[in-house]
A protein has these predicted regions:
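Short, aromatic- and cysteine-enriched interfacial helices/patches
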Residues: 23-25, 122, 146-147, 167
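Acidic, low-complexity, intrinsically disordered interaction modules
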Residues: 25-133, 139
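Hydrophobic, Leu/Ile/Phe/Ala-enriched alpha-helical segments that form helix-helix packing faces
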Residues: 18-22, 35-43, 163, 167
Length: 173
């Protein structure tokens, strides 16, 4: 890897990058902090080269691997990790050792669900989120065409929303 990569250490750095290279993303401080914290929690850091291209570095090892890693992939993997952590917290709170254990995992679960809402909004702005909405709309349009009933236009909205809710609630696709 020949490119010199500058790793982000603060949410403001990610926001500054987005303001220049991905203005539609428009992350808040909290959004950027969530992305950076999840990456750090999984032993990765993200950064950019002098052209603004984003990279991911494995920070678990000295001189860890650096690879091109677009922001859409960052958001997607963070959504997946969030989903896995929600499942883990849900399992622990469903079978706690004691009341303190329950409270700990309930608090963790609520925090992860709050992260999920922010991540879902970010995911919708990615190429993956846009593609999912297009697929859902196309599917709904086909259903309406096959049934031939104009009254069923409401079905299109329902199906599109259902697919969207399913996909954002079921990370790890």
């Amino acid at each position: 890897m020949d490119a010199e990569v500058t790793l982000f250490s603060k949410p403001e750095e990610l926001i500054a990058w987005a303001d220049t290279f991905d203005i539609l993303l428009n992350p808040s401080i909290e959004d950027a902090a969530i992305l950076l914290n999840y990456m750090e929690g999984h032993d990765y850091a993200i950064g950019i080269d002098s052209d603004g291209k984003m990279y991911r570095q494995d920070v678990a090892e000295e001189n860890g691997e650096i690879e091109p890693y677009p922001i859409d992939d960052v958001i997607d993997i963070v959504c997946e990790w969030n989903y896995e952590l929600i499942l883990d917290a849900e399992a622990h709170r469903s079978d706690p050792k004691d009341f303190n254990d329950y409270n700990e995992y309930q608090s963790r679960y609520e925090s992860l669900k709050a992260d999920e809402k922010r991540l879902d909004r970010l995911f919708d702005k990615t190429s993956y989120g846009k593609e999912l909405i297009e697929v859902a709309t196309e599917l709904a349009d086909r259903v309406i065409a096959q049934l031939g009933n104009k009254e069923l236009e409401k079905v299109a909205v329902t199906v599109a929303e259902g697919v969207r809710e399913y996909s954002t609630g079921k990370r790890g696709r």
